[in-house]
Amino acid sequence: MLAKRIIPCLDVRDGQVVKGVQFRNHEIIGDIVPLAKRYADEGADELVFYDITASSDGRVVDKSWVARVAEVIDIPFCVAGGIRSIDDAAKILSFGADKISINSPALADPTLITRLADRFGVQCIVVGIDTWFDDATGKYHVNQYTGDENHTRVTQWETLDWVQEVQQRGAGEIVLNMMNQDGVRNGYDLTQLKKVRDVCRVPLIASGGAGTMEHFLEAFRDADVDGALAASVFHKQIINIGELKAYLAGQGVEIRIC
């Protein structure tokens, strides 16, 4: 059995790490490189960096900080933000990233997933899915351009349909960003995770809602996700990664101990 992964998420805007609640009202957390090093030193299995306004601004993630991160950490990291072409991805990977993640650009051009997977291998291609539960329809819908609330829009895709579509096109991993839970710290949406797990054949990462160590345990035990991504509980030092891993190991979760 592969070890479960603990993945701090660093949302980047204007060269700094920020964090919002339900993808809105972002506050500045700190500088990118020191935070990345701190999480690596604490025992994170990998890091994810999202330049949250790159796609809506029509630009690609700033590669200068990607190179600086690669110099100070020795764990895998994934970068997302406005990647629209093989050339965009190649440049980010050449600066030291281990994976690239696409979200809004994949919705705009789903063939991008296949082209990237064919060029770099599926193990390198992550698709992020920003999913929102609509009380009015009782359905989960995929959202686009969520890094800027002025540009966010609901797409035609229901979440489960998009999960299956991106797998068929070559996604090697899926990060499910559950917008209703984001930053609220009341637990992952286990109902949604279980539904996605039933149709997801590639590694599945839960994102949005972690507030306690028990929330991580529930995601691993009840929804069988491969990794759990979180931001605010790590940024605000509510949970220490080393202590979290010790707790999970004590509960029988296969995890890499620092």
Swiss-Prot record:
Subunit structure comment from the entry: Heterodimer of HisH and HisF.
Organism domain of life: Bacteria
Job of this protein: IGPS catalyzes the conversion of PRFAR and glutamine to IGP, AICAR and glutamate. The HisF subunit catalyzes the cyclization activity that produces IGP and AICAR from PRFAR using the ammonia provided by the HisH subunit.
Residues annotated as the enzyme's active site: 11, 130
Gene Ontology molecular function: imidazoleglycerol-phosphate synthase activity; lyase activity
Gene3D superfamilies membership: Aldolase class I (3.20.20.70)
Enzyme class: lyase
Cellular component GO terms, alphabetical: cytoplasm
Keywords of this entry: Amino-acid biosynthesis, Cytoplasm, Histidine biosynthesis, Lyase
InterPro entries associated with the record: Aldolase_TIM, His_biosynth, HisF, IGPS_HisA/HisF, RibuloseP-bd_barrel
Species per Swiss-Prot/TrEMBL record: Salmonella dublin (strain CT_02021853)
Gene Ontology terms describing biological process: L-histidine biosynthetic process
EC number from the UniProt entry: 4.3.2.10
SUPFAM superfamilies: Ribulose-phoshate binding barrel
Catalytically driven reaction(s): 5-[(5-phospho-1-deoxy-D-ribulos-1-ylimino)methylamino]-1-(5-phospho-beta-D-ribosyl)imidazole-4-carboxamide + L-glutamine = D-erythro-1-(imidazol-4-yl)glycerol 3-phosphate + 5-amino-1-(5-phospho-beta-D-ribosyl)imidazole-4-carboxamide + L-glutamate + H(+)
Cellular compartment(s): Cytoplasm
Keyword Lyase listed: yes
Record's protein name: Imidazole glycerol phosphate synthase subunit HisF
Pathway(s) served: Amino-acid biosynthesis; L-histidine biosynthesis; L-histidine from 5-phospho-alpha-D-ribose 1-diphosphate: step 5/9
